Every structure is written in structure tokens, then in C-alpha cells.
Design a protein with these regions (language model features):
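A short, Lys/Arg-enriched interface patch at domain edges and termini
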Residues: 44-82
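Polyanion-binding surface elements
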Residues: 1-20
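Short helix-start
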Residues: 4-8, 29-55
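DNA major-groove recognition helix of helix-turn-helix
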Residues: 25
Length: 82
């Protein structure tokens, strides 16, 4: 997992569009930074925001390492489809 995720990648984690993620950043729902090539979400924020959703789907609490592994899996799967 990179230090920052794009809004597209964050959308994959939250099952939302990249536009929805940008709106969430602008509305202060999630932390993000604006760069010349678009918004980015810091890794720590991506972990925080996606933890509840992923843990509810898994039906249990996950360690940070497990959570990062699942996030990497989601990102890899979606990149292969794109």
C-alpha cells in the first residue's frame, strides 16, 4: 500500500465513486490533500475510514497488518480489472 491513495482507489475501498470521495474530502468527512494531479488520501486515513466497513464484512476485529493486506487485495483486484 502506498503512502497515499487516489480518490479512485479510496472509492474501491468504500464502494463509492471517485467523485463521492472528492466530495467527502471537501466536506471534511475524510482527510485528504489536493495535489496538482488530484486529491490523495493518506494511508493512515484510508486505514481508519475503511476499518469499520471491512471489519463488519469480516465479522471480527482485524489487526493493522490484516487490514492492510485486505486493502492491498482490493486495490490489486480492481487494478487488474481496470
Amino acid at each position: 500500500m502506498d503512502d497515499f491513495l487516489s480518490t479512485k482507489e479510496m472509492g474501491w475501498l468504500l464502494d463509492r465513486s471517485a467523485g463521492s470521495v472528492r466530495r467527502m474530502i471537501r466536506d471534511g468527512e475524510i482527510e485528504g490533500v489536493r495535489l496538482p494531479d488530484g486529491f490523495r488520501v493518506p494511508k493512515d486515513e484510508a486505514l481508519r475510514v475503511s476499518r469499520d466497513r471491512i471489519e463488519s464484512e469480516a465479522g471480527r476485529k482485524l489487526s493493522d497488518r490484516e487490514l492492510e493486506g485486505l486493502i492491498d487485495e482490493v486495490l490489486t483486484t480492481n487494478e487488474e480489472r481496470a
